[in-house]
């Protein structure tokens, strides 16, 4: 069977400093994410913003600069190359990511949004993601597993994949969904009742995951199964 193209939407990273006359910036793709896609039978390709902009939002909040009609059209042409799409995590979010989330929802394209990608799914569909009240508990780079995760909807795609009701996850974020759009169902929460996983039940595969399953895929089989099922759906 032909391998599906999985588009990973890039993140803008600005490495420039005052002494840098070139003001370099880059578009980043997470290695663990492209590795797990390849390992599960997909071909990972980068989806970059189609714009001449050099300055992007530096926070994980909605960006005021919107895409032009031409930039939207060009980005759609990139998305049409893909059988599925992933919105990455990161410390900043951009309007083009919200646009991708909405486009995938409206066109029933399989999508996973991870961490900031989860935020951009929520924002793209009209909801809100804001600073978490206890970042010291949820931004834990020092441990593999940071807190518990509990499935609250067993009639969900997510539960059919993980097949466990209570388990541990990592946590590397400072923003959380505070206003969930009606298009999404909350299917799992953290042990302090933060929304951990959302999904659109009327779509083929549309998941927003607050934690980072790609960082656990090598050691936690149920987390790898998320990507296996995703790639399988993208083959259809």
Locate each region found by the language model.
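N-terminal beta1-alpha1 cap of cysteine-dependent amidohydrolase-like domains
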Residues: 1-116, 123-127, 136-161, 174, ...
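Acidic/charged, solvent-exposed loop-and-adjacent secondary-structure segments enriched in E/D, K/R, S/T
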Residues: 131
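Short catalytic/ligand-gating loop segments at beta-alpha or beta-beta junctions
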Residues: 168-174
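Catalytic core of the metallo-beta-lactamase
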Residues: 197-198, 205
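Active-site-proximal beta-strand elements of phosphoester/diester hydrolases
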Residues: 207-211
């Amino acid at each position: 069977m032909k391998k599906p193209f999985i588009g990973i939407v890039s993140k803008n990273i600005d490495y420039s400093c005052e002494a840098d006359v070139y003001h370099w910036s880059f578009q980043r793709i997470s290695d663990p994410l492209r590795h797990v896609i390849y390992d599960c039978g997909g071909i990972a390709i980068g989806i970059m913003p189609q714009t001449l902009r050099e300055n992007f939002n530096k926070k994980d909040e909605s960006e005021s600069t919107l895409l032009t009609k031409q930039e939207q059209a060009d980005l759609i042409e990139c998305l049409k190359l893909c059988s599925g799409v992933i919105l990455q995590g990161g410390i900043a979010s951009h309007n083009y990511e919200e646009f991708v989330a909405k486009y995938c929802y409206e066109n029933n394209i399989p999508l996973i949004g991870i961490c900031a990608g989860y935020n951009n799914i929520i924002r793209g569909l009209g909801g809100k993601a804001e600073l978490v009240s206890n970042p010291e508990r949820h931004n834990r780079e020092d441990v593999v597993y940071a807190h518990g995760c509990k499935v609250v909807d067993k009639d969900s795609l997510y539960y059919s994949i993980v097949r466990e009701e209570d388990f541990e996850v990592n946590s590397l974020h400072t923003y959380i969904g505070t206003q969930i759009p009606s298009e999404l169902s909350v299917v799992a929460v953290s042990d302090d009742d933060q929304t951990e996983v959302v999904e659109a039940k009327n779509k083929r595969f549309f998941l927003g995951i607050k934690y980072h399953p790609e960082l656990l895929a090598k050691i936690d089989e149920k987390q790898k199964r998320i990507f296996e099922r995703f790639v399988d759906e993208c083959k259809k």
